[in-house]
Every structure is written in C-alpha cells, then in structure tokens.
C-alpha cells in the first residue's frame, strides 16, 4: 500500500534460515577469523554497516553467512521507535542463542543499560558511528589475521550490502533540529558534514564500479554544509561550495541517477528544483512534513506554515511538472484533536502528494513529546491511521495514473520466471512502488530499459519494453 507503518529493515550476512542452524552445527568449520553481521534500521545505518564490514575485510577477516561458522556476530541496532528497539533486542537475542559471542553497536547501543538489562551476556556495546571502537572489540575477541592474500580483491567501493547497481551515499552525520518526537540528535549528535571532496570521490568510485543510482542520505540532507561556515572544499583541483545545491549539481554530472532523501523543508530547497527540471538529478523529493496542523507542528518543533508549504509545492510543480514528492506524517501525536487530524486530511487532499508514509505515534524513551500533552489511545491512533490511508491511497492512485501511456526509463532490480521488476525515477528502493515488466525474462538487474507504462494502481506500475540498454 502507499501508506506504511514503520518496520525496521534487517540486512544480514547470516542468510541461512535459523531452523537449519542447529543441523548445520555438527559440520561447522571455523577458521578463527569469521564474522557474522546483522544490520537493522534505515539506509544511514546500512552505510555504517558497510563501512565496518569493509574495514573488517581490509583487516583480513572473513564474513560468513552462518551463525555456526562465525567466531563472533556484530549486531548494528536501530533505536528510532519502540518497534525498532524490540526488533533490535530480538536480533541480539537470536545472535546470542545461535552463536553466543555478540558485539552490539548502532543507535540502541547508546543506551547500554537498556541492552544489559535484557542481554547481560553481550560482550561489548558501542553507540552509533563508533567504527574504531567496534573494530577494537573485534580485535580483542577474534585476533586480527596475520595475512589475507585476498585483501587486495576488495573493490575500491568497499563492501556493499545493496545490489551492485545502486548504493547509498551518506553526506553527513547528526542533526541540529530538535523535533520533540525524535531522539536522533541525542544518539548521533549535531550536524557534522563530510568534506565535499570526500563525498565526490566516493560517488565517482561508485559510478566507475557500475552503480547506476546514488541515493543521497543523512539525518538532514538539506542542511548539508551549514556547519562548514561557508568554507569551500576542493575536488579535482577545483573549489566546490559545501551546500546541498552545489553538491547535488556536482553529483548530477557523474552520469548516474541521483536521488535525494530526508530533505528538511528549508527555504533553500527551492534551489534544488531547477536541477531536477534540467535532468541533473531525479525529480524526486523526499521531504518529511510530519503534520499539517499549525498547533501540532509547533508542539513538534517543526515548520508550521502550511499555507507556505502548499505554495511551495505548487511552485515546485510549475518549475518541474514531473516532480514526485514523498513525505511522511505522524498520526496520534500527543494532544492531537479530531480538528487537528481533519486539518491533516484536508492538507493531503490539497497537496496531492505522490508517495506518503504514515507512522502511528510511538512513545520513544527520552522523547520530549511523551510529556507535552495527553497521550492518544491506541484505538484512536488506529482509526486515524486507517482513515489517513484511505484518503492517501486514492490520491496516490490518481498521481500514478498520469504515467499510463508514457515511456519511462526503468532500472531493473530483479528478474524471475514471470518477468522483470524495476523502478522508475518515481520509485526509491524498498519504500516506494515497483514497475512490473511481465514476460521479459532475458533482462538483468542493473539494466536500464525504456518501457511504456500500460497500467497502474495506487502503488505500482506495469509496463512493456520499448528499448533496452544492454550496458550494466
């Protein structure tokens, strides 16, 4: 469906089903330097996992897909909301039961006592982006191999947990905003932007390795460079301004799709839209708005001028008619009245957003929002969630129907016996819809094809190939 509740995403090197681990244990073979890895949460956490795994491979460790073959398991946790905490604690429990030697890192790791209360046998716990600490602990329990002749085979892009044709590019860490429902700044700190040259170097390596789509992520992507005080960086001997518009312009020149995620609604977002209209970056804007009631937005410590937001949406679409807007909202925020909720529904009907995610408010330990107003009952939250979903599903169906009859570039993600599955510029991996191309079993993941859209529903598209680019 178009509207989804939050469910932590789990990526793991341990792809043997749990039910087979016990049987496999009798034949397990260990070399003394094998690491298993479980990564939970958002794409930003996935990038952290890739960085840790890359350094482990450089240090000579092997990455295994079996609990039994692992000399140690690392669990990179998520602590965004209570559902994420539960998922993380369950993953730690499974790793302890199936292996016994576990290091915990990530957002939930910032709350060591909470983990120790449930899992006292965990070897070590570190917080988010504590790469060096994680590696130090690994070296302590699984001594670093003396030599690995295959280290030189690690690609320049490092270890990637995504398919080879797309990759996440993290441009900063932390956030300077203090939204009352969020504890990310307390876990990951204030905004810390990467040097532009470093980002562009990584992007170039990704494209040269065959990556067709770069997904730009951070806690607050549109704030990139605010902490740099206007200082420029250098790339290829040329000065580069360190702001999101300048960075996006440079990324757009590399020949891959560039998709921006987690755009806070600052005024200078306007500067990105012409780049989308020019085709430098994808006409796709992931801009979490969270609510539409001025009263609730004020309680959230979010921008509260809905009239300005509607004006901005209209202005953006005039400049870039193909623009796809994704947003997320929270229903059942403490103190939310029926009137507040109706304002939100009215906003949806007027804004006509393309893709929308919906969260039922969840009490996050340490969030200011838990205590600023009366909590909403689960029954009311559930009712509002379903009403929200019903309204947005109709809007999303209408927005997708405009593509029927058009020919679009489709990036192929998967191929099975029924045909190919891909995405258009309107679809980010994992969170948006897909384009189904039935019968095309000769295509391969990573191929870019031209396809005519023949059908749509509220979430997905169906298409027929017009022309295929055989370059992976």
Curated annotation (Swiss-Prot):
Residues 161-398 form the Radical SAM core domain. Residues 401-467 form the TRAM domain. Gene3D superfamilies: Methylthiotransferase, N-terminal domain, Nucleic acid-binding proteins, tm_1862 like domain. Keywords: 4Fe-4S, Cytoplasm, Iron, Iron-sulfur, Metal-binding, S-adenosyl-L-methionine, Transferase. Residues 33-143 form the MTTase N-terminal domain. Its cofactor is [4Fe-4S] cluster. It is an enzyme of class 2 (transferase). CDD domains: Radical_SAM. The keyword Secreted does not apply. Its main location: cytoplasm. GO terms for biological process: tRNA modification. Signal peptide: none annotated. InterPro entries: Elp3/MiaA/NifB-like_rSAM, Methylthiotransferase, Methylthiotransferase_CS, Methylthiotransferase_N, Methylthiotransferase_N_sf, NA-bd_OB-fold, Ribosomal_uS12_MeSTrfase_RimO, rSAM. It catalyses: L-aspartate(89)-[ribosomal protein uS12]-hydrogen + (sulfur carrier)-SH + AH2 + 2 S-adenosyl-L-methionine = 3-methylsulfanyl-L-aspartate(89)-[ribosomal protein uS12]-hydrogen + (sulfur carrier)-H + 5'-deoxyadenosine + L-methionine + A + S-adenosyl-L-homocysteine + 2 H(+). Its EC number is 2.8.4.4. It comes from the Bacteria. [4Fe-4S] cluster 2 binds at residues 175, 179, 182. GO terms for molecular function: 4 iron, 4 sulfur cluster binding; aspartic acid methylthiotransferase activity; metal ion binding; protein methylthiotransferase activity. GO terms for cellular component: cytosol. Catalyzes the methylthiolation of an aspartic acid residue of ribosomal protein uS12. PANTHER family: RIBOSOMAL PROTEIN S12 METHYLTHIOTRANSFERASE RIMO, RIBOSOMAL PROTEIN US12 METHYLTHIOTRANSFERASE RIMO. Belongs to the methylthiotransferase family. RimO subfamily. This is Ribosomal protein uS12 methylthiotransferase RimO. The lineage of its organism: Bacteria, Pseudomonadati, Pseudomonadota, Gammaproteobacteria, Alteromonadales. The gene is rimO.
